[in-house]
Amino acid sequence: MALVNPHGKEKVLKPLLLTGDELVSEKERAKSMKQVRLSSRETGDLIMLGIGGFTPLTGFMGHADWKGSVETCTMADGTFWPIPITLSTSKEQADTIAIGEEVALVDDESGELMGSMKVEEKYCIDKAHECREVFKTDDPAHPGVLMVMNQGDVNLAGPVKVFSEGSFPTEFAGIYMTPAQTRKMFEENGWSTVAAFQTRNPMHRSHEYLVKIAVEICDGVLIHQLLGKLKPGDIPADVRRDCINVLTEKYFVKGTTIQAGYPLDMRYAGPREALLHALFRQNFGCSHLIVGRDHAGVGDYYGPFDAHHIFDQIPEGALETKPLKIDWTFYCYKCDAMASMKTCPHEPADRLNLSGTKLRKMLSEGEEVPEHFSRPEVLEILRRYYAGLTEKVDIKMHSHAIGK
C-alpha cells in the first residue's frame, strides 16, 4: 500500500522554497522591494508554505478564502482548510503598497529576508469574528485570540516565493524535517499506515501509552513536535527533543517511531487546530492523527473531547488522514497499569491523572513527582532544566489537567 496523498485536488506536494540560481536571483531582486515584517506566526506559516507542509496553498489567503476558511472550513475553490493562513500589516504600510506590487517578507525578530510576495489583494477583516469562529471565543486572555487581535489591520494576499527555512534546519538538525523527507523515511521503512503524535510537551506516561496504542495498529508513529513559539511556562523544544529521544531509546522497540519537528507556532485553537494538524500531517505522509484529551487546547476553553467530535462534523472525504480517537488515559493503581475510561472499571480515587500542565507545575514548584507519572530518565532531564531556570512562570491548573 502507498502512503496517503498530499492534501488538495492535485494530490502532489507543492513546496514553494526556491533553490539554486533562482533563489540567488530572486533574493537579489527582493533587496530593492518594500519590506513587510513578519510576526513569528507568519514566519512559521511561510516556512510551512516553503516546505510543502501547507500544500496546496500557493501563498497567503485572499478575502474569499479567509471568509470560507473561517466560517465553513472551506476555501473558495472547495478545498478543505480549517484555519485561515494570512499575512497582516498596518493600514499605513498597506496604503503604500500597490496591487500587483512585489514585497519582501522579512522576519521581524531576526531581520532575515524570508521570501517575497506579489500582492494581489488588500483587505480588512473583523478580527473578533475570526476569533469567535476559529477559537470559539474572543476572550483576550486566550493566547490565540490575543495573537489575532494584535495583528495588523490589513491583510495582504498573494502568491509567495520562499527563500529560507530560518534557523530550524541548523538549530534542530536531525529533528526538523520536510514532508518530502518524512515521506522518504516512511517508504524506506516500508510503512504505509503512519500515525502522527502531536506534542508540545515532554512525553509523560499517558503520552507514551497513546503512542504505543498507535504502534500496535499502524506500521509506525511519527512523534511530531512543534518547534515554533509556545506560551510562557511551556518547555522549550530542545529539552522536549532530549526527553523524547531517551524515552524512545529506552521504552520503545527500535524502528517503530520517528521523532521529527515542524516550524509552526502554537495557535491554541483546540478542535479547529486538531483539523489543521490532521491536514498538514497528510502532507507529511501520515494516515492517522492521534487525538487524545483536549487536543491543542488551552485552559478551559474547550471540552476535553471537542477535538474528537469535530472530525465527525466535517464533510466526508475532506481529509485522507483520519483521527485515532483515544479516551481519557491515566495510571490505575488497582489495574497496576496505564488504562483508559474504556478499559478501567475502578473509581477516580484509584487513578493517577496525568497531564503536561500538571507535570510542569510540579517540576516548576519543586514538588515530588509521583512514581508512575513519567519515566525516571525523562524526569532527570526535566529536573536539570528547571534547576537552571532563573525566572519562574506561574503555571495555572485547568480542569482537564486535574482530571475533572
UniProtKB/Swiss-Prot annotation:
Catalysed conversion reaction: sulfate + ATP + H(+) = adenosine 5'-phosphosulfate + diphosphate
UniProt keyword annotations, A-Z: ATP-binding, Nucleotide-binding, Nucleotidyltransferase, Transferase
Domain of life: Bacteria
GO molecular function: ATP binding; sulfate adenylyltransferase (ATP) activity
Coiled-coil segments on the chain, per record: none
GO biological process, one term: sulfate assimilation
Keyword ATP-binding: yes
Pfam families given in the database record: ATP-sulfurylase (PF01747), PUA_2 (PF14306)
InterPro entries named among the record's database cross-references: ATP-Sase_PUA-like_dom, PUA-like_sf, Rossmann-like_a/b/a_fold, SO4_adenylyltransferase_pro, Sulfurylase_cat_dom, Sulphate_adenylyltransferase
Documented EC number(s): 2.7.7.4
Family the entry assigns: Belongs to the sulfate adenylyltransferase family.
Protein name: Sulfate adenylyltransferase
Organism: Chlorobaculum tepidum (strain ATCC 49652 / DSM 12025 / NBRC 103806 / TLS) (Chlorobium tepidum)
